[in-house]
Structures are given as structure tokens and as C-alpha cells.
């Protein structure tokens, strides 16, 4: 029926772009299938003009290569692919953070699983890497969950909450402190920017505590107004709560941290990951303000702050592969397994994946195709993704292979398996990845900032109050020279707060490795 509708539209409205749901998002769930199709169709005219204009401008500038665009599946595709399916570009930026996290973890982490967070000015994005693979979800939203539109399209699982460096601190009528979800944004921005902001933010609190140098923000390009931040916190937070400005600033960071910890707890529980056995990677310009506190609260043994952490998602784009996911519906189960039908669907997926790789000219040795089945126990409502090997489902024991793989995946996520239940397979996916270049390292180009390797300044810490701490220049830390907090590690792009008794060092690959320690999980409001 959809194909016939397309024929009629092409006859009567030639040139008008059409999106067919069975091609874009074959799903049994009508709402998700419909909403993703509507979103994609509405974006096609806009993205066609945008991509066309971009390619024309680059051609005029002398660029003769291919334009690649990021996708929400953690890959890049040719610009023409985005024209055909612009929904691929939704939420593509945050989807790159776990790609960078996976790369960094492979270099400097011994844990199998990794939690990745990216703290910007307005949002806090959390994602995961499980044993080198980035989990997907079908529950991505265009804005706040349940208050915006569900995309219904498979993408990297990223949970976002309104908690960033620009999050506004406020006290409600009952005397309870909140941080966010409102944000000062970049305009007018935090009070300390001096651009008209009047509401105290996380950045203002960090400035009052001495965690940010007012004369070295963005390497000294912006001078911050400490006095204005102090006044705003005193008037809007400290006064109503009966606290000193420093205690109020600490409280702001505590509440901010708890919002983030809750977001991490939600996604790790949903994906069956134990934070106490996972490393955690902090990225984004504001991550360093509470990354150690977050890691300690979650019980993570190791915290990594990449040298490129302030641009974590951009770094992920640098090391991502060209690739795309393909999906086919085919329902079968472990008690009456249709081997021939499954084999046909896997062949379709393989053909589509190989055609994609051929289109970009990727050599076979640089191309990998991963297969997944979306499966569930009989009569359950939701499926989980189960990694499979296509060749294992073509033999006489295909049903047993599917059943055992599902039981293992279900137990890993939910700590439970039901050997006696029938396993239903609903849909089949292939993810093709084409490596276009070997990236040896993610490093920031060296620049003589004129900063000394170690300085000192006053900073406020829970339990000890205002004290003089060393401030280390990130880029000048010697590899594997172990140091202990309290301290601040500073670069042109971020400030990393290291509480007392926490050890840290810089790895040979340039990343900061921190052992948070359980002692730092105490809440500063109790100090």
C-alpha cells in the first residue's frame, strides 16, 4: 500500500519528497513508526536545502572530497544519505560522546564497562559503553522525556537532563534549594559573564568557591565578575537559606551533582551495568567541577578526564566510523523457529550493508557488519537487543543459539533468566561500520599559554573550608607523576576540582586518571 501511495504521489506531485515507514522504521509499534516517518518527512525539504547549500559552498571553496554528516547511531554517512533520511541527524552530537569514551577507555581503562557523561552549559548527557559496544534505544526524545516528541527511531542510548554549567539555582517557597532545569544559556549567561544575567548559576557557585580563575576563563579571553556572582548567590540563595555565600555555593554544587547521579543511576539500571565495576569518563567544559564527586557517589573505581574532554562529542566524531544501521521485521520464536525466514532476512540485511559500504568505496578489510536481534520472552511488552553472529543462525541449532544468547543478555541486564520460557524474535538489525582512517591519538595541539606548571590560589572545600591549593596546568602535568588533592587542574577549556585525599595522574596518552575514593562521597551539606 505504501509503495502504491508513493507511485501516486510521484505521478501527481513530481519532485515532492516522500518518506515510507516500512523503509525508514519498520516497527510493529504504530506510534513510533508513524512519528518517526512524520518527523523525517517534515525535515526533508529543510535538510535538502541546507545540505545542498553546504556542499555548493564547499565546492566553491575548492573542496573536492565527500561531505560526511554525523548520525544518532554513532556513525557518519554521506550527505546524500541525510537527504534521504534526515532523521538520522537528530541527536547526533550527543551520540558521539560514547564513541570518544570507548576510544579513551580502550587506552586508559581496565574495566569492561564505561559510563560516559558530557556536561555542557545547559544539559548533562549520559551514555554507556558495554564491553566495547555502545547500547542503542528506541526511546529517544526530541526534548524532555514525556514532554516532547518521541523519535521512535533506533539510536545511541543517551539520557539528557537539564543540568549544566548555566543551570540556575533557586529557592522555592518552602525553602528548598533547586538547581535547574532552567538555564541562563549563553545569553545572558551566568551572572559572572557581566552580560545581563541576574540569576545565580552553577558557574557562579564554582567561581565563588575558587574552582574557576576569574582571570583565566577560556585561557584569559573572558574576565569573570566574582563580586557579581557573590552578590547574586547571597541575595538569591544564601540569604533565604541562612547560609554563608560559600556554604550556599557548595549546596548548589551538591544539588547539581545529585541531579546528575540520578540520571546516571537511571541509565545504568536500565542497561544492567554496575557502576562499582565500571570506569567513568567526564567530558564537556563544566564536567571537571564535580566529576570526582560524581564518580565517588557512583562508587566508580576510576575516573578519566580526556585531554580533549571539553570537546568530547567533537572528539567522538573524529574517531567515528562511516556506517549505518538497517532493520527488518520478522517474527519467529524458539519453539517454532523459522530458519529459512531468518536466513532470508539476514541476507537482506547483509545485502543492504554491503551496498552501503560499496557506495562509499570502503575496502572489505575495513568493513565490519554486526548483527542484532530484538527479542523478548513470550508475552513480554518490550524487547532487548541481543548481539548475534549471522552464521550461527543458519545451522540446525539456530533456535538453541538464539535462545541461549537471549537468556545470557537478559540475565546480564536484569540479573534474571527464565530457561523455561519461549523466546520471541521480533526484528533483526545489521550495523555496518567502515573505517576510513586510523586515528592514533586524540590530543590537543600544544600551545604556549604562558602559564606556569604550578600556581596557588584559595579554594573552598567541604570539611576544611577556605584553603590554599596548588593549581596545576593540565598540559604541563608530567605523565604518571602521582599527585594528591586538594588541588585544581586547569586548562584553557576546563577546571577539574580534586578534593582532599584523592590521587590523580596524567597518563602517557594525555588523559587525567583519578582514583575518586569512597571518602569523597560525603555530602558537603553535612560537613
Model-based region annotation:
Residues 106-115, 136, 301-306:
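Phosphate-handling active-site elements
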Residues 36-50, 88-92, 110-113, 320-336:
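A polyampholytic, Gly/Pro-enriched intrinsically disordered region
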Residues 4, 8, 16, 92, ...:
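C-terminal, non-catalytic interaction/recognition modules in large multi-subunit enzymes and RNPs
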Residues 108-130, 167-171, 292:
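Gly/Thr-rich phosphate-binding beta-strand-loop-beta motif of the actin/hexokinase/Hsp70
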Residues 1-94, 187-237:
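Gly/Ser/Thr-rich active-site cleft segment
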Residues 127-148:
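Basic, amphipathic juxtamembrane/active-site segments
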Residues 89, 114-118, 158-160:
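Short glycine-aspartate micro-motif
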Residues 109-112, 273-277:
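Short helix-loop-beta connector
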